């Protein structure tokens, strides 16, 4: 039955497919919002109305891309599909909870979209800082709906995290240790731990904001002895681990892709890669206040957060150089997935370098809330997370569907996307250094040139997104079946054929230790 299979699904592959489709759909919505932003900023003067509308679009763009595109695709889609296959488990540990995790997302998305349509919408930015998010500056239900949306998305992620942690720790074959699982499995495990530890703090913060708005509490209101800075601490204690949650599964996928298309049987420095991810996960929790260098912290506090933030560059560097070492001496196959992976390494490194610039508290005081910050995090998200998703998608597409994408189209798609995102975000570094502030719908004429170029780049990216839809249609319509897959001895997910049967690993796997 259709309903039994897709509505009441307990199969990790089907739920993974649902996550993928939902994430792709949300990605279209988020892309549409980003095109609205770049259309508004394409030239000086007003296009879409006042700044409230503009900020509602910016806020929705951020929430949609983070909570309904990147996280569902990376953790829900790739995680559900690949983790059980990679560790030889018959399914996830809690299959029905897995289904609930997915079905909490569409209502959450609905609440977020509803928040934009009631009153004047939630024009708070994705950070939802009070007093702007309080009931005076944002009277009406908009921010409340956004908070409920975040609650649902948060519950979904927490349940998913519990599920992945249990699955990865308990459902491996007894003969293998955690240090014999693939890097993608490790990345999902670490991501799940980060989610489990950070989301409750966000839930606390936004619940306090909810009571401030509706029940007359004063957690964040100085008039009653509260402090708006407390909200910033609570939010960023979640918000900083969150950005690592968005990129860590990507690290795992890139490790697999680089290894596979270099013709290697294992990545360079496996243990170093694992420890680097664990270090990044740990350090991600003790650097949150680098988002708050401008709120007037003590100089010694700023010194600590500056140095702690810079330390994260070390494990990140370990990962980048290990990827390069994996490429070294390999029989490199220039497949589309490999192009995405190489693009990821290059552009993520650039994003990391601007991150090091911003970690200096003294420099950040000048650059905070300018387009330099926007350029920085879009290099790591729009060219890190998205390139990893695209690389993983074209690499595992034959596994998910049993069909192959057209190689030439896939390479053309990569090229258009590469040009588009760089043309969009590279000029924003110049705008930021010239002092153009974020979250404004209009700007002085002096900034016109780079903004126009940036907006042109965004339309090139839009072309790439449309081409991707065509590519998927073309692949599903042409039905070129997969003949054989290489390197299956170290890529366990492929051993059941493409696509794998509905139930895999129905009996425990026999592990033979090889002394090679």
Curated annotation (Swiss-Prot):
Membrane disposition: Multi-pass membrane protein
Cited Gene3D superfamilies: Cytochrome c oxidase-like, subunit I domain
Alphabetized InterPro entries for the sequence: Cyt_c_oxase-like_su1_dom, Cyt_c_oxase-like_su1_sf, Cyt_C_Oxase_1, Cyt_c_Oxase_su1_BS, Cyt_c_oxase_su1_dom
Mitochondrial matrix topological intervals: 1-11, 87-94, 171-182, 262-269, 328-335, 401-406, 479-516
Mitochondrial intermembrane side: 41-50, 118-140, 213-227, 287-298, 358-370, 434-446
Residues forming coiled coils: none
SUPFAM superfamilies given in the database record: Cytochrome c oxidase subunit I-like
Superkingdom of origin organism: Eukaryota
Localization, UniProt: Mitochondrion inner membrane
Binding positions (Mg(2+)): 368-369
PROSITE patterns for this protein: COX1, COX1_CUB
Residues at which Na(+) binds: 40, 45, 441
Family to which this protein belongs: Belongs to the heme-copper respiratory oxidase family.
PANTHER family (UniProt xref): CYTOCHROME C OXIDASE SUBUNIT 1
Protein's UniProt name: Cytochrome c oxidase subunit 1
Lineage of source species: Eukaryota, Metazoa, Chordata, Craniata, Vertebrata
